[in-house]
Amino acid sequence: MILNLDGTKPIYIQISEWLENEILTGSFESDQKVYSQYQLAEMFNINPATAAKGLTILAEEGILYKKRGLGMFVSNSARGMILSKRKNQTLKRLVFEIVLEAHRLNVSKEELISMIEEVTIEEAEE
């Protein structure tokens, strides 16, 4: 992963989202140790405090848990929590933006639904 250092999204958020993606794709399983703040700092050439902040976000959400002296580990419910969070935050925001733009363009609800149905998974992944 390449961090977007010039973007508006803070680096620690990008780190936490990258770790979430690693969990979703199966790179990290339940109860498996994740990278330390120092490993992340070296991997992405960032300050260890920034990496720690990304890990802390996931720990506060219950996606990771800390074993004193051993590091951070993936919680048993991490995958479900990430999926739920992304569905409730990311998808709702995207749908809101699409509906708002459709309204601006005078696209009817039926037309919008038709457009969504026309998009196949293969097209969306391209």
What are these regions (language model features)?
Residues 1-34, 39, 89, 93-125:
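Extreme N-terminal segment that seeds HTH/winged-HTH DNA-binding domains in transcriptional regulators
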Residues 27-28, 32, 60-69, 73-76:
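Beta-hairpin "wing" of winged helix-turn-helix
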Residues 33-65:
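N-terminal helix-turn-helix
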Residues 57, 70-72, 91, 113:
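General helical structural elements
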Residues 70, 74-88:
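Short, charge-rich, low-complexity interaction segments located
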Residues 83, 125-126:
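Short low-complexity, flexible loop/linker segments enriched in glycine and/or proline
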